[in-house]
Amino acid sequence: SGNSFGDYIPYRTWKPTIVVGGEVLKPTSWHFAHEQWGGNQMQSRFLKNSKRLMTNIDYNSWVGVRIFGDAITRSKSLDSKEILTQIMDEKFNVAAYKGKPVSFRKWNGQLRQPILLVTPRALVSVSPQIGFVHPKTELDTLGIDESDTKCKFN
């Protein structure tokens, strides 16, 4: 594909078919090509301070610190039990530059977040995909739902 359209064509056609020389699509929490919902500003600030592109490990670390910072601020406490109670509260969420606030699944403690679908050089889409509905939050269309698992957070 000569790096000119292999990132885009396979995933943006009416009827997807094999494209020789195309790129591999993979899910990730962050990618340097993500620019929506303030992502470009976050990328720019990170690049200015660190002299490199942000990776998903950098992003996940930032989200973790942001979650604890917000939980401490909202609970007005440094007690670990109060912080955890705040984080696991159904109303707790954090803006994370992905268009939808991230939150935790109460039943298994998993972080609910939009997932970026990327090639090595391009953002193709952000999941959950349009049309998938859930009675509680469309972010629960990603992963295993509460009714489909015996896993419980203790």
Model-derived features with residue positions:
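Extracytosolic ligand-binding ectodomains
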Residues: S1-N154
